[in-house]
């Protein structure tokens, strides 16, 4: 998993609340069990005018030329609500997004994102609105998300602080998924196993 320390990138926004996982990645695209290849289906029902995904919707934000290559997504409260599917952060990451900034997230989506190297950043509604206004007013506007300092820096230079559980921050800073986190304690696990009485082995 790619470590997340600090990232500066083009920002795009979807100014909507309660964006659920079926909107992020519709159920008909969930048959794969590997993480790659989901980005093309991200927000399928909004991005395309046809079921096959051949006709882009020119009015959808992510399809606008000025936002091509965006790596930071701004959204409103309760992002990632709905059914539990790890494919949602897979699709967002495969599309090229590194961080999602919103006032709140659904709990399961929040945890799944951290486990898959996608940083969910909670800011106040007013702070998110300021970021959206700045991004909308300036083509090519970039935002910096610094996990080492837990700060978001707006296109104008305004700084906003955010919090993240230290365990989640450690995993993201070091690029550790659940398996990687376990392997990082290999020495301690080995010592524990070496000291297990023979009758318990």
Swiss-Prot record:
Pathway: Amino-acid biosynthesis; L-leucine biosynthesis; L-leucine from 3-methyl-2-oxobutanoate: step 2/4
Assembly description: Heterodimer of LeuC and LeuD.
Matches recorded under PANTHER family: 3-ISOPROPYLMALATE DEHYDRATASE SMALL SUBUNIT (PTHR43345:SF5), 3-ISOPROPYLMALATE DEHYDRATASE SMALL SUBUNIT 2-RELATED-RELATED (PTHR43345)
Molecular-function GO term, any one: 3-isopropylmalate dehydratase activity
The enzyme's E.C. designation: 4.2.1.33
Enzyme class, broadest EC rank: lyase
Assigned GO CC terms: 3-isopropylmalate dehydratase complex
Keywords per UniProt: Amino-acid biosynthesis, Branched-chain amino acid biosynthesis, Leucine biosynthesis, Lyase
Annotated family: Belongs to the LeuD family. LeuD type 1 subfamily.
Domain of life, source organism: Bacteria
Lineage: Bacteria, Pseudomonadati, Pseudomonadota, Gammaproteobacteria, Alteromonadales
InterPro entries assigned to the protein according to its UniProt record, in alphabetical order: 3-IsopropMal_deHydase_ssu, Aconitase/3IPM_dehydase_swvl, AconitaseA/IPMdHydase_ssu_swvl, IPMI_Swivel, LeuD
Gene this protein is translated from: leuD
Species name: Shewanella sp. (strain MR-7)
Protein's job: Catalyzes the isomerization between 2-isopropylmalate and 3-isopropylmalate, via the formation of 2-isopropylmaleate.
GO annotation terms (biological process): L-leucine biosynthetic process
Protein name, entry field: 3-isopropylmalate dehydratase small subunit
């Amino acid at each position: 998993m790619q470590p997340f320390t600090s990232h500066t990138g083009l920002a795009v926004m979807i100014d909507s609340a309660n964006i659920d996982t079926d909107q992020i990645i519709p159920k008909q695209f969930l048959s794969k069990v590997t993480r790659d290849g989901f980005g093309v289906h991200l927000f399928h029902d909004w991005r395309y005018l046809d079921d096959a995904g051949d006709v882009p919707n020119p009015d959808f934000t992510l399809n606008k030329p000025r936002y091509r290559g965006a790596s930071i997504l701004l959204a409103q409260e309760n992002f990632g609500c709905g059914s539990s599917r790890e494919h949602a952060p897979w699709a967002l990451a495969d599309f090229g997004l590194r961080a999602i900034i919103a006032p709140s997230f659904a709990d399961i989506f929040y945890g799944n994102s951290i486990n898959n190297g996608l940083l969910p950043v909670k800011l106040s509604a007013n702070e998110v609105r300021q970021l959206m206004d700045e991004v909308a007013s300036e083509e090519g506007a970039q935002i910096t998300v610094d996990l080492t300092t837990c700060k978001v820096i707006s296109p104008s230079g305004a700084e906003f602080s955010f919090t993240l559980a230290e365990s989640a921050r450690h995993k993201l800073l070091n690029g550790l998924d659940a398996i990687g986190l376990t392997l990082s304690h290999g020495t301690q696990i080995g010592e524990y196993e070496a000291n297990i009485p023979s009758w318990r082995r």
